[in-house]
Amino acid sequence: MFTIIDYLKFYKDTSFNDVRWNDLDNLLGAILVYLPVPSFKEGKNLKSLYDYALSKTLATSSFMAPKAMEILNMVKDSKRYAEITISDFTNIKNEEVQFGACIIKTETEKIISFKGTDGSLIGWLENFRLAYEYPTYTQKLAI
């Protein structure tokens, strides 16, 4: 069975002209939004994002954070992803709210990637609020 890791390794030097942006590239964005870094607005290419992540890593209980760092390290020098930028990276987690999102820009696409809740108490509360509150505070943040 092939994994996202296999895809990223196989296509790392393949341009988007040869193989268009697709669902597996979207999955890369869905993983990178779990990077344990402070929020930032300006666009960063993957090399800059990696350096930023190394210097600004936040403490986290997310099991996805180490995998996101590993995958970012793997793709930061690839030809395929050399021109994409990550911007409007939002990472909010406190006693009342948990929210994460970023914008991924390619030459032709703009993709918004959202982080899901984790197994922490605030993650459970966020999920519970979906049953009785609309829109939730985090849904408002997403707009």
Language-model segments: which ranges?
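Non-catalytic, mobile gating and regulatory segments of ester bond hydrolases
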Residues: M1-I143
